[in-house]
A protein has these predicted regions:
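A short, conserved alpha-helix in the catalytic core of glycosyltransferases
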Residues: 1-51
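Short glycine/serine/threonine-biased micro-segments
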Residues: 2, 54, 125
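Active-site-adjacent helix/loop segment of glycosyltransferases
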Residues: 35, 39-120
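Membrane-interface aromatic/basic loop that binds lipid-linked glycans or pyrophosphate carriers
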Residues: 117-144
Length: 144
């Protein structure tokens, strides 16, 4: 697994128009890119000697609450979209419907216990549901 924050790409071998899937935002674009490069017989090298210290969310000036909402929404939206893209909508639905139900249950349990993490599960459920019904990745800071 190669994470996007540590990729070096030879742009001579990649068509810039096809670089990233325009539908994906924030998560899974790096994995999708590697999968497409591999499918097109491009070489992907991994050097296990390299180490990258990735400090998440440091490139944004969003407050933690807004970023947490966006992060959780897009994490679930992108997982479903990616799985659907490579396996079809039926298999994606079969795999992710239980996750949707569990996420909703966790949300309600956390609401009852007045746990502040309930917002995380609310946005996970909303992101997953949006992807399942075919909505584009739309949640951005200005929408909150």
């Amino acid at each position: 697994l190669i994470l996007g924050f540590s990729m070096l790409i030879n742009l001579k071998n990649v068509q810039i128009n096809d670089f990233f899937d325009k539908n994906i935002f924030l998560y899974m674009e790096d994995i999708d890119l590697c999968r497409r490069l591999d499918k097109n017989s491009q070489t992907i090298l991994i050097n296990k000697l390299f180490r990258v210290n990735h400090i998440g969310a440091k490139s944004t000036n969003l407050n933690n609450e807004i970023f947490d909402k966006i992060r959780n929404w897009h994490w679930m939206w992108s997982q479903y979209y990616f799985f659907k893209k490579y396996n079809g909508n039926f298999l994606a639905f079969i795999r992710f419907f239980p996750k949707l139900i569990l996420t909703i249950i966790k949300f309600y349990i956390l609401c009852i216990s007045k746990n502040k993490n309930k917002i995380r599960y609310k946005f996970r459920a909303k992101g997953l549901f949006s992807s399942m019904i075919g909505k584009k990745s739309y949640l951005r800071p200005e929408n909150l």
